[in-house]
């Protein structure tokens, strides 16, 4: 499905300013939408909206359907009468420029628990009706999620496969008993989702009303310690005890001699095919209730994926296996119709991957930071772009453009300079705007840049470094960094290259 000629900014809500240690769905999110509109932008791209997992990654969430309760605007809960002004006083340890998850998570969760209790005791009839309607509408995933989260709390530090066997195997009598024993915590997790969904939908409606579409992100793989894997063990490559036989990753390449062992469970694609890809169809349908456009991560895994024995410590000793291919996308399209999906086709892209993307008619991705290694045949260079493409200066996995430039080889720097007809030393101060202009000028239908590049920030402001487990996903900006000239220059480029 072709996308209109537009442009936008990549920024996860956790990176927004705010007093409570991490960005959330409060006033700063609405201010950011207003800024996007004033800068002439039409897209706000985010990372996955689920809760953070190991290493605080949003790509390892405990559910493919649930939202991140850490994003809940606590001030809005106070306006409902569920928190006090004293509850909203920030911890002095909170930082404006980085998220200290070790401090933020317990602080926010304690206040969410207080709000849940107050709501249970003092909710109005209208609030109770809205809560019950939400629970009924989302029961297909919400009940498993809430029970899973309650059981995970009751068995701290243990994989679900190490829970009592009756719970790990999901024996009905054991589940009923657990639901009774953990009723209060189950209600808490339901409440958190209700708060997240109503706040998120309000923000999304605000953005849509101002001409801003939300670009979401759907990881191909699911976290092993997730409600999805526990609830649908038949759909994943697990042994009879619920343990992973094989895990996901990518093989060794130029950047990594041992590859990347992600550790996600792999899909049992034969089981998905047997029921017409119902789980995937429902996942995609649900995702589109939250966002307007979806980027599917690691698209190449649908053509073929790298299978690694779970016993292997690295990704070296794996093998390629065929993915579901076109059949999955045909099943989704048959059920849901044509959808605005972006295929993240970065990495090892073989002819079968490109053929699948073209058969699905999904736009792929081009990243300009990858364009200047090699010669004129590098497909990331703008003269090779196609209209059905999304071009980025960099993604959340890249360095900032200023950081990339400072670390680039002399050959890369010279290539950029020759390509632009300039001297390399002339680009030191404005390389970020140079790449933004290059992206906006591209024939690609969609152009996106991280906010860090608009602000000209260096490598210290990078969002993620793949393969490094700690210290990432923590970057935040402050409005003092955003000058009027930033929005004005972005708006001028957007108008110049007909992306408004």
Indicate where each model-derived feature is located.
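Surface-exposed amphipathic alpha-helices with a cationic face
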Residues: 37, 200-208, 333, 357
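Terminal-tail/helix-coil boundary detector
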Residues: 479-500
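Catalytic domains of carbohydrate-active enzymes, especially glycoside hydrolases
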Residues: 27-52, 289-291, 439-441
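Alpha-amylase-like alpha-glycosidases and glucanotransferases acting on alpha-linked glucans and related
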Residues: 1-5, 10-12, 55-197, 222-448, ...
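Conserved, well-ordered alpha-helix/loop/beta-strand core segments that scaffold catalytic motifs
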Residues: 189-221
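Outer-envelope exported proteins of Gram-negative bacteria
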Residues: 47, 213-215, 219, 293, ...
């Amino acid at each position: 499905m072709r996308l209109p000629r537009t442009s936008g900014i990549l920024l996860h809500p956790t990176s927004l300013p705010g007093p409570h240690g991490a960005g959330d769905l409060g006033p700063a999110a609405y201010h950011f939408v207003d800024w996007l509109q004033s800068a002439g932008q039409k897209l706000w791209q985010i990372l996955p909206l689920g809760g953070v997992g190991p290493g605080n990654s949003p790509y390892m969430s405990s559910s493919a359907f649930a939202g991140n309760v850490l994003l809940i605007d606590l001030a809005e809960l106070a306006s409902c009468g569920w928190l006090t002004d004293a509850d909203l006083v920030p911890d002095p340890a909170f930082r404006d420029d980085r998220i200290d998850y070790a401090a933020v998570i317990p602080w926010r969760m304690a206040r969410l628990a207080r709000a849940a209790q107050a709501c249970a005791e003092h909710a109005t009839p209208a609030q109770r009706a809205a809560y019950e309607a939400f629970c009924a509408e989302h029961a297909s995933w919400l009940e498993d999620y809430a029970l899973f989260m309650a059981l995970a709390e009751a068995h701290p530090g243990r994989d679900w496969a190490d829970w009592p066997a009756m719970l790990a195997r999901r024996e009905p009598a054991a589940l009923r008993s657990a639901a009774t024993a953990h009723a209060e915590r189950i209600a808490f997790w339901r409440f958190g989702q209700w708060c997240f969904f109503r706040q998120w939908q309000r923000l999304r409606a605000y953005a849509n009303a101002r001409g801003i579409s939300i670009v979401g992100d759907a990881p191909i793989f699911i976290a092993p310690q997730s409600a999805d894997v526990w609830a649908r063990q038949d759909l994943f490559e697990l042994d009879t005890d619920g343990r992973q036989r094989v895990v996901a990753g990518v093989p060794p390449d130029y950047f990594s001699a041992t590859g990347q062992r992600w550790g996600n469970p792999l899909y049992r694609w034969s089981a998905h095919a047997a029921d017409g890809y119902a789980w995937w169809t429902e996942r995609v349908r649900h995702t589109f209730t939250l966002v307007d456009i979806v980027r599917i991560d690691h698209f190449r895994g649908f053509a073929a994926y790298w299978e690694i024995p779970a016993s292997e410590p690295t990704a070296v000793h794996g093998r390629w296996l065929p993915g579901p291919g076109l059949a999955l996308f045909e099943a989704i399209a048959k059920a849901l119709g044509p959808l605005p999906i972006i295929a993240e086709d970065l990495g090892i892209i073989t002819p079968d991957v490109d053929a699948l993307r073209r058969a699905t008619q999904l736009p792929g991705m081009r990243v300009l930071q990858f364009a200047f290694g090699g010669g004129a045949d590098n497909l990331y260079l703008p003269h090779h772009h196609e209209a059905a493409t999304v071009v980025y200066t960099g993604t959340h996995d890249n360095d900032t453009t200023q950081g990339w430039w400072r670390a680039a080889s002399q050959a890369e720097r010279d290539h950029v300079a020759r390509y632009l007809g300039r001297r390399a030393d002339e680009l030191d101060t404005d390389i970020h705007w140079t790449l933004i202009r290059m992206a906006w000028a591209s024939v690609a239908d969609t152009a996106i840049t991280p906010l860090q590049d608009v602000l000209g920030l260096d490598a210290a402001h990078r969002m993620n470094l793949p393969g490094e487990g700690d210290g990432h996903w923590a970057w935040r900006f402050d409005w003092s960094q955003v000058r009027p000239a930033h929005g004005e220059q972005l708006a001028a480029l957007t108008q110049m290259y007909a992306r408004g």
